[in-house]
Structure formats: C-alpha cells, structure tokens
A protein has these predicted regions:
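Conserved N-terminal catalytic/coupling substructures associated with nucleotide/phosphate chemistry
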Residues: 1-179
Length: 179
C-alpha cells in the first residue's frame, strides 16, 4: 500500500465511521495495543487478509489521534506477529493525515494448507480466530477440524466404515431411489 492509498483509506473509514471484514482500527496514540492476536489470527485465516489502521480512535467516532511512535509501534506489532503460528509477516505503511502520523499493517492471508493461524501462547483451540464483519470471533472446534482435515486430506464422506456391511442397506429404498 502506498501512503496516498493509506490516506484514502483513512478518509473512507472516517466517512463511513465503520470497520469491516478486512479493516480493523486501533488508536495507538498512548502505546501499542496489547492484544492484536485475535485480529492477526482472523485476518490471516481469511482469503483476503486484512489491514489494521493505527492512529484512529473508534471511541471518538474514528477521529485521527495519531500514533505515539511509528518506529516503536512497528517493532512491537512485529513482536506480536512473531508469536503467531505460522508467523505473520505484516507489511507497514505510514502517512501523515491532518497533522498526525497514521500507520497501517497489512496482514496477508496464510495459505489454506497452513491454517488455522493462531496465537501460540493460547494454543490452537483457544488462539484461533475468524473474522465476522468487524468482529474477531474464536473459531469453533468444527472450524479448526475443517482446516486440520483439509491438511490431512481427510474426506469423511469417502471413508470406509469397518463396522458397516451390505446387510445394513435397504435394498427396496435404494431401488426406489435409483428407478
């Protein structure tokens, strides 16, 4: 993302006063947000990835409040990215908007064979998230299982069931279905 594109994105966020499926806003004028893990996970686990915009305050109607220290913010966000599995490689862009510094972190999508991306400190079942609208929600056991079975090439609908045999089939029902 170029600085001018970040400026346009900031204008759009301020105009719509909303986050979205691919946009998360964090104030960051008093320091780096402590917990980005849920957003890092949810953006990494969707095909489109996402963008975290630092320097707008949602509680003030998405007012530009700036970033406390651009260099330190990028360093600390990268530290949080390194605590994900697989590691997230954010792409940073900075710009000045209405006299304050704004920073974005583009979070790329993780290849589906490596999903779910999760926070190592919480483990796969508690640290995996999915994005729904503007919310980062914990993945269900089923969602995690779906990714894991995809990786293992498990096709539950094609697996033979050892305890099943032809005597369990309703021959008349099958004939009616086929004919």
């Amino acid at each position: 993302m170029l600085s001018i594109e970040l400026n346009d994105l900031v204008k759009h966020i301020i105009k719509t006063k909303a986050e979205s499926q691919t946009i998360e806003v964090k104030a960051a004028h008093k320091g780096t947000p402590k917990r980005l893990y849920d957003t890092l996970s949810s953006f990494s686990n969707q095909d489109s990835g996402g963008i975290i915009v630092f320097g707008l305050d949602e509680s003030l109607g998405f007012e530009p409040v700036g970033v406390y220290d651009l260099q330190d913010l990028q360093k600390k966000v990268t530290e949080q990215c390194n605590q994900m599995d697989p590691v997230v490689r954010a792409i940073f862009t900075t710009t000045e908007y209405e006299g304050v510094n704004i920073c974005s972190a583009e979070i790329p999508s993780i290849d589906i064979t490596n999903r779910p991306c999760y926070y190592r400190g919480a483990g796969k079942t508690k640290g995996s998230y999915v994005r729904v609208g503007d919310a980062d929600l914990p993945m269900t056991d089923y969602e995690i299982y779906s990714f894991e079975s995809y990786k293992a090439h498990v096709h539950d609908d094609e697996r033979p069931i050892d305890r099943a045999d032809l005597s369990l089939l309703d021959e008349a029902g099958i004939n009616n279905y086929i004919l």
